UniProtKB/Swiss-Prot annotation:
Role noted for this protein: Located on the platform of the 30S subunit, it bridges several disparate RNA helices of the 16S rRNA. Forms part of the Shine-Dalgarno cleft in the 70S ribosome.
Stated name of the protein: Small ribosomal subunit protein uS11
Organism ancestry: Bacteria, Bacillati, Mycoplasmatota, Mollicutes, Acholeplasmatales
Sample GO molecular function, one term: structural constituent of ribosome
Organism: Acholeplasma laidlawii (strain PG-8A)
GO biological process: translation
Amino acid sequence: MAAQKRKTTKRRVRKNIPSGIAHIHTTFNNTIVTITDPAGNAISWSSAGALGIKGSRKSTPFAAQLTSEAAAKGAMDNGMARVEVYVKGPGPGREAAIRSLQAAGLEITAIKDVTPVPHNGCRPPKRPRN
C-alpha cells in the first residue's frame, strides 16, 4: 500500500490592518458589503444571500444590517478599527448597513456616495406595478 500524501492547505493569515474601506453595494434585490484595505485588497465580505437569507427578504434593511455586522466582525478579527464607507446603489439597506457598521464597533471616518449616475445612457427597467 502506498503511503498517503498529506494535503497542504494554506492557512488564512491574520493581517493587522488598522484602517480600511467599507464598500456597501445595495441593489433593489440584495446588499453586498466588502471591507478592503486602503489598497483595495478584500479583507472580508458578506452578502444577504451568503448569510442564508432567501428571496425577497434579502432586500430588507434588516438583511443589510446582518450583512454589515458579519463583514465588520471579519474585519475586526484582522485588527481593523477605522473605516471609510463608500455607498453605491439605490437599495433599501443603505442607512441600516452604515448604522450597523458603527454599532459593530468600527469607527466611521467618512461616508461617500459613489452611486454611478448615467448621462442618459441605457433605458431603465420598467417601474414595478404593485
